[in-house]
Amino acid sequence: MSIVTHRIKEYAALLADAEKTGVGTNPLTSIDPNLSVTEAYHIQLENIQMKVEQGLIIVGKKIGLTSLAMQKLLGVDEPDYGHLLNNMEVANGGTIPIEKVLQPKVEAELAFVLKKDLMGPNITTLDVLQATDYIVPALEIVDSRVKDWKIKLPDTIADNASSGFYVLGDKKAKVDEINLELLGMVLSKNDEIVNTGVGAAALGNPATCVAWLANKLSEFGISLKAGEVILSGALSAAADAKAGDTFSARFAHLGQVSVHF
């Protein structure tokens, strides 16, 4: 085993232990300031592969850091991605036990469900629209296995892009039924509006985010599969969640999606 491979397995184990024990780890970049983005993706894949071997199923992907504000905050110029597993979906209106998360935040976004595979490179926004079966409103519960969210880009990538859970709404729409750029969203916490957003907040168009993902995945020989759920990126800033909170997001033409802690 090479030194790099050993290091990737070691860091993957730190994150896996943090998830198992509920105690956050120190940032990997504080342990290894030279940790690269490519190595971070391999750490993520190491833990995903382990979960698949334990019987979990990859059901989709999530895209993070799609807003310019978040990219500037972490000093990066492109998004990142993580994997969605079958134990991460929560029913619309369902409850997430607070002991299942470490330091959760809630984001509202649009989910794309594909009707055909997409394999980069050179995938365009139009390719994504043509490959999309339907779009559905979603809440993503982001979470970090890193103490106090003290993350740099390699930290969040290694940590499956700070994924936690996700909730899909009930109303499905075809891409020609809505204007993705102008689609408005209102995020409420305990019946008080905490954030508003619009489709253009995600790289100008959420479908552009999905195209980026297809092209990025091709660097690792991975394609987007028909039937997969793709969370296309937050339409506003994330809101902190604690026990007893209820979140709901209302989308123009797409109805409401909610979750309780």
Describe each model-derived feature in a short phrase.
Residues 217:
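Conserved PLP-enzyme active-site core in the AAT-like
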Residues 208:
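Glycine-rich, small/acidic residue-mixed loop/short-helix segments
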Residues 2-203, 246, 254-261:
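Catalytic-core "active-site belt" of small-molecule-metabolizing enzymes
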